[in-house]
């Protein structure tokens, strides 16, 4: 007995390693997966703060206007030939990063960052990145927080108007080359997703349409007084409304798609699937409910959604309760028979499929209606009956 109990005691007191993790079989190498979270980098200053100086404009007139920061009363100059090139240009790949504005919801974008001359870097109180579809602002202001006006300027420059959603930028004074379309697409695709580009090769003019209006506002400020592949100075303005009927139809269709998307987000997913016909069970249920007891009949959408169990208005749901009781007959009938006037029950004439029920016909038959003709009233006689204005005797 002692010889057999000793091995069992040894097995019971044997040390067993404990581990909470998965057991790795022998001969296999345990791989440890390390997830590295890429941190956002801070925005860098685009220019040296020591170089920022507020110099007055050169004197070109006799009177200096402190409100417009311009001289007046001098010789008239060509506003296109007298333009100077921009002092800097934004490089999104290197200059973008987080700032103090990232901690505040609803912050605007930095105008000087778009122009490439912001000296603050990560200490800036505005955003240093490109606008996205999730950056939504009031129509009265642009993405930089500047107030917009009810109408455009005469030269289509400035902030723009809040009366129309303008996503198209006009670019003039482009150096004409054979690859002008490729050059324009390469430089302006940096500021956001481009929907359409139209280039007039012989005139050096281009129209760039962005998918987001905020990107168009950013591109207008970023490319003002810039140059492409040559030393030209671009003239960037807002584009006027396109008179092309196809463009107007395309814009109207885009507005309808935006409205449909907004309605789609506001409604429940199952309701949207039923309306769009993507739910097979909903299609079968719709076909049965909209037949109204008639084989092969399916009511149109306006009839189905106006009258039925799922009608929006309470009047349309009236009559589709589970059971109704007729006041005169005293027997239960289905809701659809009570609503559409099916065959009458009880002692009737036996007419089926009529417009009126048997109880209504019985009430009309029992009613006694007497029609009496009213006597014609005689014409009133008075002192002016025989009076004639043309008579000489009166």
Curated annotation (Swiss-Prot):
UniProt KW Nucleus keyword: yes
Predominant cellular place of this UniProt entry's protein: nucleus
UniProt keyword list: Cell cycle, Metal-binding, mRNA processing, mRNA splicing, Nucleus, RNA-binding, Spliceosome, Zinc, Zinc-finger
Biased composition (Basic residues): 30-43
Localization terms from the record: Nucleus
ZnF (C3H1-type) ranges: 104-131
Keyword Zinc: yes
Alphabetical GO biological process terms: mRNA cis splicing, via spliceosome; positive regulation of cell cycle; positive regulation of RNA splicing; spliceosomal snRNP assembly
Region (Disordered): 1-59, 373-394
Any one of the GO CC terms: U2-type catalytic step 1 spliceosome
Pfam families: RRM_1, Torus
Molecular function terms from GO: pre-mRNA binding; U6 snRNA binding; zinc ion binding
Subunit structure: Associated with the spliceosome.
Function statement: Involved in the first step of pre-mRNA splicing. Required for cell growth and cell cycle control. Plays a role in the levels of the U1, U4, U5 and U6 snRNAs and the maintenance of the U4/U6 snRNA complex. May provide the link between the 'nineteen complex' NTC spliceosome protein complex and the spliceosome through the U6 snRNA. Associates predominantly with U6 snRNAs in assembled active spliceosomes. Binds directly to the internal stem-loop (ISL) domain of the U6 snRNA and to the pre-mRNA intron near the 5' splice site during the activation and catalytic phases of the spliceosome cycle.
Notes on the domains: The C-terminal RRM domain and the zinc finger motif are necessary for RNA-binding.
Listed name of the protein: Pre-mRNA-splicing factor CWC2
Lineage: Eukaryota, Fungi, Dikarya, Ascomycota, Pezizomycotina
